[in-house]
């Protein structure tokens, strides 16, 4: 176990768990000081801090995997999602996770190259933190879920031309170095690249209209390219704690002949 019933740390030794033939049922004592189990639910922080856990196969009748069910399971390499699961919220701190696989009989979710997608393969929902290198999103993807790439180690992404939506904090605290977003994206939501401490270069498309609060908070940008003919609306905290010298250290690149419109815009 990772934690005792009072929430205190335990020096657990579990490395491989196969409970595919078991059931999770309601009742019994508390775990993590104040939580109780529910029928067929992998509850909030149920396996939290199981530092030696490497692989897990869940019960075949699980219907829901809640937020941070595997919080800080730093050795976890793979998770197998059963056919019955219809709701999943990602877990933080799974720094070694390389593969999320899904039963072929599951109609709510699928996986591609170990990445969790919606059943129709149009949305990326959970990207394993243990993956390295660059990553090209599947051509079918039109949306990226909130926190989907949080804390990931990918340095460069290739986005599909049909991408139309990115969720809040989707790339929060990731290692991304450069970003080129397609023109199909009209707005960037709150905190989408917040605390991306390696992000230097960003390219935004022709139709971008809104940069919400904290989009580039904590990002040491050196070059920001915007091809939209008119400047997008920015929140009062779009760049937040990026620093007082941001306007001196980051070069803004705009379309030829449009500089006066960007200079005249106060928002």
Feature map (PLM): residue ranges:
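Conserved mid-sequence domains
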Residues: 68, 214, 238-242
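Short, aromatic/basic amphipathic alpha-helical patches
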Residues: 2-8, 32-34, 45-46, 236-243, ...
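Short, flexible, glycine/charge-rich loop motifs used to bind or transfer phosphoryl groups or to couple energy/partner
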Residues: 7, 46, 69, 89-90, ...
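Short acidic, glycine/serine/threonine-rich loops at helix termini
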Residues: 70, 91, 171, 193, ...
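Structural signature of tandem-repeat unit edges
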Residues: 12-40, 50-64, 73-87, 94-115, ...
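Extended Gly/Ser/Thr-rich low-complexity repeat segments
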Residues: 2, 135-136, 147
């Amino acid at each position: 176990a990772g934690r005792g019933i009072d929430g205190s740390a335990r020096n657990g030794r579990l490395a491989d768990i196969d409970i595919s033939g078991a059931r999770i049922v309601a009742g019994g004592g508390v775990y993590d000081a104040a939580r109780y189990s529910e029928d067929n639910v992998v509850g909030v922080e149920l396996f939290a801090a199981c530092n030696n856990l490497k692989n897990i196969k869940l019960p075949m009748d699980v219907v829901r995997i809640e937020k941070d069910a595997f919080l800080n399971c730093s050795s976890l390499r793979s998770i197998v999602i059963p056919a019955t699961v219809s709701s999943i919220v990602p877990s933080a701190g799974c720094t070694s996770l390389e593969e999320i696989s899904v039963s072929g009989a599951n109609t709510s979710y699928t996986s591609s190259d170990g990445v969790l997608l919606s059943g129709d393969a149009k949305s990326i929902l959970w990207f394993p933190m243990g993956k390295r290198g660059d990553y090209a999103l599947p051509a079918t993807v039109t949306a990226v879920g909130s926190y989907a790439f949080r804390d990931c180690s990918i340095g460069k992404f290739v986005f599909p031309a049909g991408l139309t939506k990115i969720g809040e904090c989707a790339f929060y605290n990731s290692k991304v170095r450069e970003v080129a977003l397609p023109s199909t994206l009209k707005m960037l939501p709150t905190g989408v690249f917040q605390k991306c401490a390696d992000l230097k270069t960003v390219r935004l498309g022709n139709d971008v209209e809104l940069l919400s609060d904290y989009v580039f908070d904590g990002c040491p940008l050196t070059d920001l390219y915007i091809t939209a003919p008119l400047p997008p609306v920015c929140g009062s905290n779009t760049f937040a704690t990026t620093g007082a010298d941001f306007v001196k250290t980051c070069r803004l690149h705009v379309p030829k002949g449009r500089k006066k419109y960007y200079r005249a815009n106060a928002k």
